[in-house]
């Protein structure tokens, strides 16, 4: 049978994912062990058959973990990967330094291990912190203040229901008029009402736009679940709250998703238009379509440095507030409120973003 476009897209995603896993498994689990063994003079412990065997064992473990067969030790696998990425970066820097400078072998390796361990501990600590970032946006369309709070990439599944409770408590303390979640609220099929129950305690109208992980998990079960917890899901739809019109568009692989979907959504004239779109793409089409503020996520700002450079190679906007070239609108890319995979951040932070919207000249 001929494959549909959706099937091709799914298989392409699977192939790309497992190619990434192959490379990431070697970089995080194998390369640091092989390199440190070589530097210490124990390369005979890691001949190439042993190296290949270790690589294959790691990939098998990851596959079993993703399939749910090793659910109890999945956190160990993913955190080992995060720590391995930190050591990979430190090892690469050390390799480059050895080409340029005379470095004592054993002292150098001790430095690699010490710096890698310190950065790993810092990453684990930083993965638990939540930073509140405030922005002021003025518009002649507004006559009174409105506080909008953005969450993005919370990743319940990778993160626990307890973490969501912490997030909700911080959000409620900010006194928002509305809360928006710009995709990737969950990332695991097994997430249910128990993990998401804290959403019922949000003290303001809450809206969700669909991210890529919601699509992967499956919307047939997820959408009714989050709606039963008081969250309005905006799928190619809008909602008016006073002078604000919130517009949600589903995440898609296509770079033209905003250009295609935005003109089809009914709009109210004179409102301050806020677009919720998960990927930081399509902002020119958004501003051309009358959007005043576009909110995105997806990038995690790289989550664990130096992956921010890899993310930057794919997306030109990865974190922060970007003005429209015409000066008429703004685009904010959240670094994410949670973490995917290891609960670690290096060179980035978990963020709750506040937008204090108000009339021009009012601050």
Per-region residue spans from a language model:
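Soluble catalytic domains of enzymes that build or remodel membrane lipids, polysaccharides, and related
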Residues: 138-363
């Amino acid at each position: 049978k001929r494959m549909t476009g959706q099937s091709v897209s799914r298989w392409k995603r699977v192939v790309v994912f497992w190619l990434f896993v192959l490379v990431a498994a070697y970089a995080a689990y194998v390369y640091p062990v092989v390199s440190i063994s070589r530097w210490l003079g124990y390369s005979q412990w890691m001949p190439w058959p042993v190296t290949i065997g270790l690589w294959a064992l790691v990939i098998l473990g990851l596959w079993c973990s993703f399939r749910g067969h090793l659910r109890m030790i999945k956190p160990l696998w993913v955190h080992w990967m995060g720590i391995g990425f930190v050591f990979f970066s430190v090892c690469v820097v050390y390799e480059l330094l050895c080409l340029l400078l005379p470095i004592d072998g054993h002292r150098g390796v001790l430095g690699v291990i010490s710096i890698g361990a310190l950065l790993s501990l810092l990453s684990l600590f930083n993965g638990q912190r939540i930073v509140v970032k405030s922005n002021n946006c003025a518009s002649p369309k507004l006559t009174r203040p409105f506080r909008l709070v953005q969450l993005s990439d919370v990743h319940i599944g990778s993160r626990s229901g307890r973490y969501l409770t912490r997030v909700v408590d911080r959000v409620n303390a900010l006194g928002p008029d509305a809360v928006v979640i710009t995709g990737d609220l969950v990332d695991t099929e097994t997430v249910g009402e128990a993990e998401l129950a804290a959403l019922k305690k949000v003290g303001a109208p809450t809206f969700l736009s669909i991210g890529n992980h919601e699509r992967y998990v499956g919307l047939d079960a997820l959408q009714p679940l989050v709606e039963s917890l008081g969250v309005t899901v905006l799928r190619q739809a809008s909602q008016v709250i006073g002078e604000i019109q919130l517009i949600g568009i589903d995440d898609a692989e296509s770079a033209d998703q905003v250009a295609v979907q935005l003109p089809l959504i009914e709009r109210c004239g004179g409102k301050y238009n806020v677009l919720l779109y998960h990927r930081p793409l399509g902002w020119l089409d958004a501003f051309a379509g009358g959007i005043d503020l576009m909110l995105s996520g997806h990038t995690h700002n790289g989550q664990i440095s130096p992956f921010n450079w890899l993310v930057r190679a794919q997306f030109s906007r990865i974190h922060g507030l970007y003005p429209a070239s015409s000066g008429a609108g703004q685009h904010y890319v959240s670094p994410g409120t949670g973490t995917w995979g290891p609960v670690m951040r290096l060179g980035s932070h978990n963020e709750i973003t506040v937008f204090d919207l108000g009339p021009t000249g009012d601050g």
